[in-house]
UniProtKB/Swiss-Prot annotation:
Protein name as catalogued: Cadherin-12
Location in or out of the cell: Cell membrane
An example Gene Ontology biological process: homophilic cell adhesion via plasma membrane adhesion molecules
Domain writeup: Three calcium ions are usually bound at the interface of each cadherin domain and rigidify the connections, imparting a strong curvature to the full-length ectodomain.
Natural source organism: Homo sapiens
Molecular functions per Gene Ontology: beta-catenin binding; cadherin binding; calcium ion binding
Transmembrane residue ranges: 610-637
Stretch forming the signal peptide: 1-23
Described purpose of this protein according to its UniProt entry: Cadherins are calcium-dependent cell adhesion proteins. They preferentially interact with themselves in a homophilic manner in connecting cells; cadherins may thus contribute to the sorting of heterogeneous cell types.
Amino acid sequence: MLTRNCLSLLLWVLFDGGLLTPLQPQPQQTLATEPRENVIHLPGQRSHFQRVKRGWVWNQFFVLEEYVGSEPQYVGKLHSDLDKGEGTVKYTLSGDGAGTVFTIDETTGDIHAIRSLDREEKPFYTLRAQAVDIETRKPLEPESEFIIKVQDINDNEPKFLDGPYVATVPEMSPVGAYVLQVKATDADDPTYGNSARVVYSILQGQPYFSIDPKTGVIRTALPNMDREVKEQYQVLIQAKDMGGQLGGLAGTTIVNITLTDVNDNPPRFPKSIFHLKVPESSPIGSAIGRIRAVDPDFGQNAEIEYNIVPGDGGNLFDIVTDEDTQEGVIKLKKPLDFETKKAYTFKVEASNLHLDHRFHSAGPFKDTATVKISVLDVDEPPVFSKPLYTMEVYEDTPVGTIIGAVTAQDLDVGSSAVRYFIDWKSDGDSYFTIDGNEGTIATNELLDRESTAQYNFSIIASKVSNPLLTSKVNILINVLDVNEFPPEISVPYETAVCENAKPGQIIQIVSAADRDLSPAGQQFSFRLSPEAAIKPNFTVRDFRNNTAGIETRRNGYSRRQQELYFLPVVIEDSSYPVQSSTNTMTIRVCRCDSDGTILSCNVEAIFLPVGLSTGALIAILLCIVILLAIVVLYVALRRQKKKDTLMTSKEDIRDNVIHYDDEGGGEEDTQAFDIGALRNPKVIEENKIRRDIKPDSLCLPRQRPPMEDNTDIRDFIHQRLQENDVDPTAPPYDSLATYAYEGSGSVAESLSSIDSLTTEADQDYDYLTDWGPRFKVLADMFGEEESYNPDKVT
C-alpha cells in the first residue's frame, strides 16, 4: 500500500497548503474521510426533513502524470450511502477516458488509472458515476459528475522557440548597450510550484555580454569593442526551470552577435610615394595610373575621396575615385611632351566622405601621399604650326597660282623630314594642289565665287622616316569676289506722282542689289543719267545708305500733257573696277486729293479737266447705250416685217422658196448651207461624215453627171439631201435648207420665163406631188391641171 500512502500524503499536503478548495457544497452527502483514501459519497434518497450532518464533499480527484509503476495508479473511491456493504450495489463509470484510461471496481467503487497520463496533452477528465441495484438494474441515485485532474510534475524543460538568434550592435558601444531579448517557454503548469519558473544565464560569451536572469535581455559587458579586431560573437544562453535550483530542467540557444561598423578609422596610404610611367602620346582623358588608400572600415564608412594638392604639374592631371575598388584613378587633363618636360611630382590627399563626429578627437580622417610621374618618349607624328589655316584667293585666278602654305614639324629628338598631301576625301574635285615638300597650296581649277564662295578641305602631314605617323589640319579658303556685275534696282517699282505735287517731294525710295557681294559689303551711289539731267522733271537724291529717293522738280503735273515719265537712274558700286548700270523708272501721273492720297490713275481722269463730273459721264454713257438699243430694235423689226411679207400665213411655210434680192446670206443661211456649193453644184466636194452619228455607209465624192430633161433637178435634190445627212457641221435639229439651183439645160432662164417653155406639154411633173408638202409649190407650178397665175408670184 505504498502507493496509497503516498497519495494520502500528497492529498494532505494539498489541503494543508491550501492548494485545493471545495468546489461545490453537497448538503445531501456526508463526509466520510479516511486518512489514506479519496472517497466521493453519492447522494442518498432520504427525506428532505431528515436532519443530516453537514460537510464538504469532494467532486474531483487528482492523479499524477507520467506514472510508471507496475500496478495501475489508484485514483480514488466512489461510495453511496445506500451501499450497506452487502454487495447489492453496482458502481458504473462513464465520460472522458472511461474504460480506456480509467476503470472502476463495480463492487467497491475504487477508481484506477490504467495508463500513464500527460498533463500537457490533457490536463483533466470529466466523468460521471452512478450506483445501480444489481438485482433490479435500476439506479439507486441520480448520476453524479466529477473531475479527475492530472497533477503536473516537472517533466518539460524550457525551450527557445525563436532560436537561434541573430543580433547586431554598433562597435565602440558603451557598457550596457542593448543587444537583444531572448525568451524561453516551459510547457509545465505555471500555477503549480516552480516547474515553469525560468531563469536565464550565459554559458558562453562572457565577458563581452551579459543577460538579465529574469527578462532575458542581453547587453554589452565591455566598452569599445572594435569591429576591426573581432566582428562576430557567438553567445550560448541557458534557460533553467525550478527557479534555477538544483534538479531543474534547462534549455539552451545560440545568439550570433555582429558588431556593425562605424567610421572610427581614417584612410591610410600603404606607402608614401607612388611612381608612375606615362607615354607622352597618352590621349587626354585617359587613365595613366591608380593609387589606393586603405580604410579598415566597411561600407560607406570606407568610401574615400581623392584630391590632388596644388603644386608641380597638378594642373595637368586629375584624379577620381573608382566606386567599386575605392582606388584613386589618375587621368590626363592636358597633353604631355617629353621634349618639354620629362617628369612631374605632386601630392594626393585621401579623406573619408562620411565622418562620425564622435571620433573627431581621434585626429584628422585623411592621409597624403606623393605621386611621381615619368614621361616616356614616343615617336610622334608631325605637328602643324596652326590648328586651322585660313586663306583668300580672288575668283578667276589663273591655274597654278600659289595662295598660301602650311608648315608641320617633327618635334622628336632626331627629327625627320615631313611630306604633305591633300586628303582626297575632303577635296574630291581637286580644286587645289600642294607641294609635297614645301607645303605650298596652289589652284588647280578656275574658281567662281558665285558658284562656290568657300572651300574647306584637309591636309595630311607624315614623317618620311615613319609614314604611318600622320597628322591632319583643316584648310579654309575664301574666294574673293571680282567686281563683275553692275548694281541694279533690287525690285521693279511702280511709281506715281500727283498732279498737284510740289517741288522737292520724295515720291519713291529705291534700293539696289549687286550679284557680286551682299548689300552690306558694298556702297552704292545713285544719280540721274547725263541726258536726263538737262531740265529734269524729277531728280535723284542719294541717301548714302544704298538707297535713294525720287524727288519732284516741278510744281504740278498734267496728265493731259503727259501721262507717263521715264526716268533713267545710274547706279554705281564702290568696287574696282567700278561697275554701273542705268535703270529706267516709269512714273505715272495720278489724280490726288489735297493730302496727297491717290484717287485715280485710270484713263477717265483725262476728261476731268474738261469740266465734266463723273456723274455726267455716266449719264452720257447711259444715253448712248439706250440709243444703240433703240437702233437695234428698229432694225430687228424691219427685218421681221420683210419676212412676214414673204409668206401668206405662218402655217404655209415654203421651205424651198427664198428671195434672190438679198445681197448677202444671213446668219441662218450661212449656218444652214454652203452658198458656194449651191452656186456651183458641179464642184466635187468631199463627203463629210457627221461626228455624232455613225453612218452605215460612206458616200464617195462624185461629180453629178448631166441629166436630160428634168431629172437633173431630182438628182440635185437627192444629192443635197444625202450630203446634209452626213454633214458633221449640220445642226442637231431640223432646219430650213434653201437652194438656188434651178437646173441645167433648161430653156427658161428665170421664173419670169416659165410661160415661154415650148416643151411644157412634154414635161411630166407629177412626181413632185410625191415629195411632200415642202415641194407643193413646185407641184402647183408645174402641174397639168393648174395654169400659171401671175398674181401668186411675188
